[in-house]
Amino acid sequence: MKHIVGYRIFFRYLDYIWNSEEHDWLAALLGGMSLLADGSPADPAYESDWNNAVEKISDSNDSYQAGIQFLKDYLEIGYIEEIGQILSDMEANKRLDLWNKAVYDVEHDLDDPYLRFVSE
């Protein structure tokens, strides 16, 4: 996967939003984006979606812009209001505090992008 650190930052950012707002569609997106033990996403399509987003932006190391492009591409499949609002907020540079927190977490290995199976 291209720019795995950027992917982890974007995942953590979305996870922070989900933890504050608990949108169903965002939970589904995060579930598919969660990483398996081998480092690949639970839904293999997200690896190519992320790689395509990274290829489309001018600076492949700019994970914020890659996240914006990822959401644009995701919404081309079908518009989902909750995801569209996150995209609008990113384009307007809102919630940068959450983005910066996500960057810090990933840089210090405080994130957990791995899929967990829980049995009760």
What are these model-derived regions, one by one?
Residues 1, 41, 58, 117-120:
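Short intrinsically disordered terminal tails
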Residues 5-9, 25, 46-49, 62-66, ...:
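Residue-level detector of well-ordered alpha-helical segments, enriched
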Residues 73-120:
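Amphipathic alpha-helical binding modules
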Residues 51-78:
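Short, solvent-exposed interaction modules
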Residues 1-35, 67:
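Short terminal alpha-helical segments
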Residues 28-40, 84-95:
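Amphipathic alpha-helical segments that form the core helices of the histone-fold
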Residues 34-60:
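Polybasic, proline/glycine-rich intrinsically disordered low-complexity segments
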